[in-house]
Regions:
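Intrinsic-disorder/low-complexity regions
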Residues: 16, 29, 48-50, 64
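Serine/threonine-rich, low-complexity intrinsically disordered segments
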Residues: 17-20, 38, 54, 68-71
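Short N-terminal "domain-start" leader segments
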Residues: 1-34
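A short, exposed loop/beta-hairpin motif centered on an aromatic-Gly-Thr core
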Residues: 38-54
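Short intrinsically disordered terminal tails
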Residues: 1-3, 64-71
Length: 71
């Protein structure tokens, strides 16, 4: 199970150690998600039904694909 910290703004953040440095998964209210590394956005999106659990799954899947392609 993934551990997300909840910031005072309500944003949920999880950090992941990758070969090219730390990446962060941000999940916001309304089902929006964003993946960043070193302050740069790698990708972002949202789910139609505002489901934060689904947003987490999509963000984690997105980051897993990036890690896999980096070799």
């Amino acid at each position: 199970m993934s551990v997300y910290r909840v910031l005072p703004s309500g944003r949920q953040v999880r950090t992941v150690d990758t070969r090219k440095g730390w990446a962060a998964i941000h999940v916001m209210a309304g089902g929006q998600w964003e993946v960043t590394r070193r302050g740069k956005r790698l990708g972002a999106g949202s789910v139609w039904n505002s489901d934060t659990a689904e947003a987490k799954r999509r963000a984690e899947s997105f980051l897993a694909n990036i890690i896999e392609t980096e070799g």
